[in-house]
């Protein structure tokens, strides 16, 4: 009711927003798990198609059995060059997936003829969808979270050096470019502010991401120690605010599941 009162056209047409009453629609569809899919395609291409390390049937059996008693095979599939560093086959697949998905969304209007805007945004549902998804060819186990937004999975860059820059470039590369957003999730340790040139490097990173075509940055600047303390006793840190995904919230106001999701992501990024 409130939405209808503040929109042009609903009163004049006597139609609800959902029934075609407004003049302009901004309808979006968001894709999930870009890195999970891109890394899976790259793993299949390298280990099965090019190297013949296993057959299609063997892979199907491993996925059905959730890599049971096959940790060496799971790690083999996981250890391919992943989405994020630049120039990998997984980078190729991520871009191809983004383009194919965007073209499909743009060419498929709603039943009422409205065009949709594609984006790659998980909205904090990586645990929810991951819990329903069986094992995947990139070495992910059944029930594990899917990848966040269009960000590379944690650990995508061997050694970890330069990860924020590489991640920024990767996310900018796969933007659907139709107005909907594909956020870059950055979780930085607060100690960066006390290092020489630390703040300037963050400023440069933000500017570079925008110049490459990035549309949104979700940024956390927090120490691991403070985060873990707040997770153990949220009420002892009532003023701690975190960027969950497309929104910020007091950490203590989040459910235990959401708090754990934020903790897991930040700890993985800083590992």
Say what each PLM segment does.
Residues 1-271:
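Acidic, glycine-enriched catalytic cores built around paired aspartates
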């Amino acid at each position: 009711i409130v939405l209808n009162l503040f929109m042009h056209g609903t009163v004049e047409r006597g139609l609800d927003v959902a029934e075609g009453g407004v003049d302009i629609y901004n309808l979006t569809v968001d894709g999930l798990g870009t890195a999970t899919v891109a890394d899976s395609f790259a793993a299949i291409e390298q280990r099965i198609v090019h190297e013949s390390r296993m057959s299609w049937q063997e892979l199907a059996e491993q996925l059905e059995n959730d890599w049971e008693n096959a940790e060496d095979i799971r790690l083999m599939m996981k250890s391919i060059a992943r989405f994020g560093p630049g120039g990998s086959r997984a980078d190729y697949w991520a871009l191809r997936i983004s383009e194919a998905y965007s073209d499909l969304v743009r060419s498929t209007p709603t039943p009422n003829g409205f065009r949709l805007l594609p984006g790659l945004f998980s909205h904090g549902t990586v645990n929810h969808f991951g819990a329903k998804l069986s094992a995947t060819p990139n070495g992910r186990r059944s029930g594990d979270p899917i990848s966040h937004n269009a960000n590379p999975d944690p650990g995508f860059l061997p050694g970890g050096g330069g990860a924020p820059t590489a991640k920024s470039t990767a996310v900018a590369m796969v933007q659907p470019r139709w107005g909907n957003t594909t956020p870059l999730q950055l979780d930085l340790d607060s100690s960066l502010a006390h290092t020489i040139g630390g703040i300037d490097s963050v400023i440069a990173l933000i500017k570079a991401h925008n110049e490459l075509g990035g549309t949104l940055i979700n940024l956390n600047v927090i120490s691991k120690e403070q985060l873990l303390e707040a997770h153990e006793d949220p009420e002892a840190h009532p003023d701690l605010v975190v960027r969950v995904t497309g929104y910020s919230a007091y950490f203590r106001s989040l459910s235990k599941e959401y708090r754990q999701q934020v903790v897991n992501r930040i700890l993985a990024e800083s590992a």
